[in-house]
A protein has these predicted regions:
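A charged N-terminal "starter" segment
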Residues: 1-132, 171, 175-179, 209-213
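Active-site loop/helix belt of alpha/beta enzymes
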Residues: 140-227
Length: 227
């Protein structure tokens, strides 16, 4: 049942003025319960970084992804930490292809795992804090998305470590004693989930051929909203 009846929306607009964004707690919690068939529900803050919503999701077991120092700060303000949940997933993971000095200090100070999209990031992090937990964002050589703007894989994408460079990335991890958590592939966003049939086996194959010891694999892209 849609909680937003015309009368309800009219009353809210009169009470709070407009423009006004309205969210329904029961609906959000219900969607979280639907997704709990997955091992981990990790919410990308770029979709919505409202700290009230983040706190609500955190209270129901959701963890978050941050792609900027601002998003890290918002996650911290909403009550998230780098500590693992019951499933072993860190409350915050920082994902990027580049990292500046200030952000480097921030992730080190809070022990936030870094999902590294470049080998340079691994060297920077390893030199600053040997043993830090990391993920590897891998570009598998193919992409997918409902448009070119949302296609984040393949040879024309700036994102991720090219799949043939995985041995070099693992060597960088070993040289600095970094702790590899898992592999991540985000090749695009869209309404078609068939690409997961390519992404997940590609990650499994990379793990097998590389001999990497990982705790998890992660397929990015998110779940679309039925507009």
């Amino acid at each position: 049942m849609n909680p937003f009846t015309p009368d309800t929306l009219r009353q809210l607009a009169q009470t709070h003025d407009t423009p006004l964004w309205v969210y329904d707690t029961d609906t959000i919690v219900a969607r979280i319960r639907d997704l709990q068939a997955f091992d981990t529900i990790r919410f990308a803050q770029k979709a919505n970084s409202n700290t009230h919503l983040l706190s609500l999701m955190g209270a129901h077991g959701v963890v978050v992804d941050a792609v900027s120092p601002g998003e890290i700060q918002r996650a911290l303000a909403a009550g998230f930490t780098a500590a693992p949940n019951a499933q072993g997933a860190s409350g915050i993971v920082f994902t990027a292809d580049l990292i500046d000095a200030a952000t480097l200090e921030l992730v080190v100070a809070h022990g936030i795992p870094v999902n590294a999209g470049s080998i340079d990031m691994l060297h920077q992090l390893g030199q600053r804090n040997p043993g830090h937990p990391v993920w590897l964002r891998i570009n598998p050589g193919f992409g997918h998305g409902h448009s070119n703007k949302t296609n984040t894989g393949g040879e024309h994408s700036k994102h991720g470590i090219w799949h043939t460079e995985l041995p070099a990335a693992l060597a960088a991890i070993a040289s600095h004693g970094l702790k590899l958590v898992g592999l991540h592939m985000h090749i695009g966003s869209g309404v078609d989930y068939s690409h997961l049939q390519e992404v997940c086996p590609a990650m499994v194959d990379l793990v097998k051929t590389s001999g990497a010891d990982v705790q998890a694999i992660s397929a990015g892209g998110g779940l679309s909203i039925p507009y």
